[in-house]
Amino acid sequence: MWMTPKRIRMEVDEALVFRPEWTQRYLVVEPAEGDGALCLVCRRLVASTRERDVRRHYEAEHEFYERFVGDEERAALVERLRQGDMSLAAVLTPEERATRAGLGLCRFLALKGRGWGEGDFVHQCMEVLLREVLPDHVGVLEGIDLSPEITRQRILSIDSNLRSQLFNRARDFKAYSLALDDQAFVAYENYLLVFIRGVGRDLEVQEDLLTIINLTHHFSVGALMSAILEALQTAGLSLQRMVGLTTTHTLRMIGENSGLVSYMREKAVSPNCWNVIHYSGFLHLELLSSYDVDINQIINTISEWVVMIKTRGVRRPEFQPLLTESESEHGERVNGRCLNNWLRRGKTLKLIFSLRKEIEAFLVSVGATTVHFSDKQWLCDFGFLVDIMDYLREISEELQISKVFAAAAFERICTFEGKLSSLQRHMEEVNLTDFPAFSIIVDELKQQFKEDQKIFDPDRYQMVISRLQKDFERHFKDLRFIKKDLELFSNPFSFKPEYAPISVRVELTKLQANTDLWNEYRVKDLGQFYAGLSGEAYPIIKGVAYKVASLFDSNQICDKAFAYLTRNQHTLSQPLTDEHLQALFRVATTEMDPRWDDLVRERNDS
């Protein structure tokens, strides 16, 4: 369930309360100490007490017990499990246990971005360990095959299992949205990652990877459109249930006449579907905005410095924080594109700004040019870039907060737009209070050029802020268009009926007059409230809830994929089929667990 509180300040919280009915449904009990849910079958603690986490553990690990369907049967089963009677459990043979262990290790290798050939190395490590610690158990490794070919096959099997789970859930989606991310790159090829966010009957939201599309093979917008429609058809989804599109703001996505979004919106138009809501500022906001605010190619210059530090200044203690930060993002080996993207982060620029004196001294020591450190205009642009990118970092991090609805995310966007207006006003007044790095540079330049009355031109930076404001206005125009829907969804009891669309006024008036529903609204989170709201009594309001809940409210899943790609760029640059890449990205981004029993059964049947 999704937990957007009903206050003006949206917080991320979830009522982590164990429900007694879960004992029979999922074979778990409330632990004597601490939070979570204790599984009666495997005696493992499910750390979270969200129903979907408890259910996923049950479906992935103990689907065998679904054969006990009657209430009396389930009650008797629970009692026997409480007493420690495991005779009914599906007993795995040694071969099946070895298969399951091999599958689990292959999944772990995929999560860590390790190559197929490293399975053999893991096998050898375990053998050395067991020979020293448990020599009598070395034989268990004989049935675990981690050869490269088997590892590849198992990753594909896990991907197929996860994809089947997604498709089964997709059939029940009341509404869904797509996120189209064309910033994924592997070696020299770009990919379009297509993520789906669907909402079920009980307002339970599912976010997952739908497919990946190789842009080298699908260069035209028409080819991309066909590939996406094929993926939707395979999942059993029609365009009539699509509510929203969130994309990057590249020309391929939002070009006025030839962008993919315009094609998809045209295709989705029908008498029975909602107008598709599109917003393009969520994905890679910090990265893509940096190209608009870097007015003097600052980052290209800094990139040259960092490459020089990595090759000639690696042993210098003053640069260790910078090198450590770089290696934590993408390891010791990094290509130029990864490095450039990393330097476009507010956090990285802030660190480099703090090291600017040390970098200048280093450049002098190796005989490199230091002309930029005496360029007044360049230094001012550098300070301004550091400050504005730090503000973009803040909003980008806020948009990574998941498990809130789009209404909360849009509120954060509006708050940031107010911040931009404040920055614009302060720059016009030559008030650098909100520009700490810029202020430091200006103070230093005033000391250096005491006779110069004009250190910088505020109009230059006002234009940048103004351009950023217009970009945000354009990116989130559709969310403003449905602002009333978002407000109605977030605050149904305080929303004035006269401001609501005519079609919903009768339902809204009836809802606000219902004391029982008001009491539920006060004590439940927003997702639980709408899940319990009668679709027969309030069909239009329930429809609005499905619509809003299906909109992407964060960039978390896309950032998770991008971080996985960046961190494992060297491994993913090896020759891999698109099928294997899709499997790796799905394993890395999904919240679902594979159904291990099904995978073991398929392995035995093959």
From Swiss-Prot:
Annotated InterPro entries: SPIN-DOC_Znf-C2H2 (IPR040647)
Location of Phosphoserine modifications: S147
The keyword Cell membrane belongs to this UniProt entry's keyword annotation: no
Single Gene Ontology MF annotation: identical protein binding
Swiss-Prot/TrEMBL keywords: Endoplasmic reticulum, Phosphoprotein
One BP annotation, GO: positive regulation of glycogen biosynthetic process
Annotated compartments: Endoplasmic reticulum
GO CC annotation: cytoplasm; cytoplasmic side of endoplasmic reticulum membrane; nucleus
Keyword Endoplasmic reticulum: yes
Subunit organization: Interacts with EPM2A.
PANTHER family found in the cross-reference section: EPM2A-INTERACTING PROTEIN 1
Protein name: EPM2A-interacting protein 1
Classification lineage: Eukaryota, Metazoa, Chordata, Craniata, Vertebrata
